[in-house]
Amino acid sequence: EVNRMAIKLSSIDQFEQVLEENKYVFVLKHSETCPISANAIDQFNKFLYERDMDGYYLIVQQERALSDYIEEKTNVKHESPQAFYFVKGQAIWNASHDHINVKSLAGAEE
């Protein structure tokens, strides 16, 4: 049973605060309507649970402004699902669609 769930982001301010307070941050852009995204968030939560670490997600349908902001900040074209790994506020890794899984997320840290 995976009890460690990603934390929901619901504002740009909250996102910036998370980046400020944490050196290493995983963020997932999640689409409520996409089956691939449903699998991606399962993998994301499993990864966080295995690592016993916090991670963050936003629902693109609800957080359009934040989603656009992340696209601008990272210069990475918006996809969903899409995962990012931030180190000291910089997105050093990203993946989308079927490329989001426990193994690829673990690889981001290397």
Residue ranges and their predicted role:
Residues 48-53, 104-105:
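Short cysteine/histidine-rich metal-coordination sites, predominantly Zn2+-binding motifs
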Residues 1-4:
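Short, Lys/Arg-enriched N-terminal segments with co-localized hydrophobic residues
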Residues 85-110:
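Non-catalytic, surface beta->alpha helical segment in thiol-disulfide oxidoreductase systems
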Residues 74-87:
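Structural micro-motif
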Residues 29, 53-67:
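Thiol-based oxidoreductase modules, predominantly thioredoxin-like and allied folds used
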Residues 6-13:
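Short acidic-hydrophobic, aromatic-tinged amphipathic segments that line or gate anion-handling sites
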Residues 16-47:
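Local sequence-structure signature of Cys/Sec-based thiol-disulfide redox active-site neighborhoods
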